[in-house]
């Protein structure tokens, strides 16, 4: 039995199995948060504190807070359109905290922070425009109607954002000089190649999707 109100359905006889799955998903979300905190704490050893807390661990917490905050209106509106841009906001916020935690940021840290920002902005805006043009992301058909499952997806994104940027954040926080760091230039070249490849691939896929003849097909070359 159910009562529909403003698009939501409240069951008068809750299913115990469904409640069990909901609890598991919520616990999984907190487990993912705990993983980020543990890695953040371990990576903070020997590094600076921010507001008396281990720097990298605090930054990880901010990333999850941003994801969980934007999850609330996303679930209420049953929309996935802000999922990817949430990652972009988290990337930029986390990098920003790392940058402003130091009074005198070395050029090395400045460049890495800039690379994070450029990459996150480019990808996030591209995905945001695409989902609004297409109207939906098919991955979220069933997920976005479930509070606990949608929360897990946002939590996984938060962990992914932190893990993929943890090394760069550590570099910024440690704030060492660029002088004599050959690995930095090797990494910069790899980043430039990867960024150019990603931009090219996204443009090829955009043109593929805009071609009506390819409707329902998957791009397999490029």
Regions inferred by a protein language model and the residue ranges of each:
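Membrane-anchoring alpha-helices and their flanking helix-loop junctions
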Residues: 2, 10-221
